[in-house]
């Protein structure tokens, strides 16, 4: 322990000395009268429309036409060191999605504070345009905050807190990539646009290795809690979060491979969501996604996605999907997807879906 402390102390001292020298070399005058060194704010928005058909019993053919997402955002930088982003979701009930500022002067160490994505799983921070299929995996949805297994609503994988991250050990010619990526942060635990509900904070961390450019292998850990609000008939209830995840991703030359596994551990217990069904102590999920480029404008994805509510075959929900992405322009995409479900918790486990989605942004 003493050796580790000594190494960390020396590393921080070295980083501080490096920062001072860099500041002497190129520094701007700070002050309330300073109005320069600020980028022009970048404004943008995107819309994802959809048509969904389902032959699930009782689904009446599926939801039909809909608007999956409408989002608008603004981002920019000040002094090139401080970055900011605001993102609002306009579909459904309008609300703030992202709102943060990040000090990002050095690749090795940066600090982000506000409302933003939780550092759990590779897929969670992925833009919906780049997921490949029409929805996030159940690893992300059940374990990162898109309708959490504990009962938390759809927070888009986000929370409010502070995060430290960086990339270490330059590799390749001209520092083309870094060997190690780390993130560690502290969040409220209640999701977006919510105040903290207890004195505890969620701690989430990840350590990732990039042995070759584009290939990341990583592990994630999460320790925290979520508080279900009190109702007229029940007091507030606190649920522990104890989660781990491991996986790999490869993105290079338009080829994509992602695979991840996540599990609830150390007694994380979900609330009873449906009458007559147990509140399972253990759950896990896994997915594998492969994206193959056929042309510059055409890419095909295949995916296996599984969530086991009770960590057993009898409680599994599997989705097998194939999606064709027609990327006609950087800002225009059409997506056609077939999805086969095998949900063992339904009276009739097997059913089919066809999704058509349109993506446009500016």
Annotate each PLM feature.
Residues 291-335, 339-342:
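C-terminal hydrophobic structural anchor segments
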Residues 4-48:
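N-terminal periplasmic/intermembrane-space "pro-region" immediately following the signal or transit peptide
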Residues 92, 250-254, 362:
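A generic beta-sheet turn/junction motif
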Residues 54-56, 122-125, 136, 193-195, ...:
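Outer-membrane beta-barrel proteins
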Residues 208-310:
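Detector for outer-membrane/organellar transmembrane beta-barrel domains
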Residues 30-192, 197-204, 208-217, 289-294, ...:
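Outer membrane beta-barrel
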Residues 326, 332-333, 350-362:
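Outer-membrane beta-barrel "beta-signal"
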């Amino acid at each position: 322990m003493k050796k580790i402390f000594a190494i960390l102390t020396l590393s921080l001292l070295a980083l501080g000395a490096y920062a001072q020298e860099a500041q002497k070399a190129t520094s701007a005058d700070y002050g309330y009268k300073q109005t320069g060194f600020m980028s022009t704010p970048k404004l943008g928005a995107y819309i994802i429309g959809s048509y969904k058909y389902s032959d699930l019993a009782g689904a009446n053919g599926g939801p039909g036409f809909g608007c999956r997402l409408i989002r608008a955002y603004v981002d920019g930088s000040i002094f090139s060191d401080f970055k900011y982003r605001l993102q609002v979701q306009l579909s459904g009930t309008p609300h703030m999605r992202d709102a943060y500022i990040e000090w990002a002067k050095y690749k090795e160490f940066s600090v982000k504070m506000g409302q933003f994505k939780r550092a759990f799983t590779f897929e969670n921070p992925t833009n919906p345009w780049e997921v490949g299929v029409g929805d996030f995996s159940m690893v992300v949805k059940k374990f990162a905050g898109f309708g959490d297994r504990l009962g938390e609503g759809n927070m888009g994988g986000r929370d409010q807190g502070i995060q430290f991250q960086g990339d270490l050990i330059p590799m390749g010619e001209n520092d083309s990539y870094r060997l190690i990526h780390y993130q560690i942060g502290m969040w409220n635990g209640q999701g977006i646009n919510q105040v903290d509900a207890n004195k505890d904070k969620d701690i989430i961390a990840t350590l990732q290795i990039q042995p070759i450019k584009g290939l990341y292998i990583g592990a994630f850990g999460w320790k925290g809690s979520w508080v279900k609000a009190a109702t007229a008939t029940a007091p507030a209830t606190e649920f522990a979060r104890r989660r781990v995840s491991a996986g790999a991703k490869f993105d290079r030359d338009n080829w994509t491979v992602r695979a991840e596994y996540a599990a609830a551990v150390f007694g994380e217990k979900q609330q009873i969501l449906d009458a007559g069904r147990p509140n399972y102590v253990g759950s896990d999920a896994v997915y594998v996604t492969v994206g193959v480029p056929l042309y510059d404008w055409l890419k095909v994805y295949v995916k296996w996605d599984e969530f086991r509510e009770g960590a057993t075959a009898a409680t599994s929900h599997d989705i097998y999907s194939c999606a064709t992405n027609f990327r006609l322009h950087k800002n225009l995409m059409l997506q056609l997807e077939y999805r086969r479900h095998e949900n063992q918790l339904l009276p009739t486990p097997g059913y089919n879906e066809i999704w058509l989605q349109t993506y446009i942004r500016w």
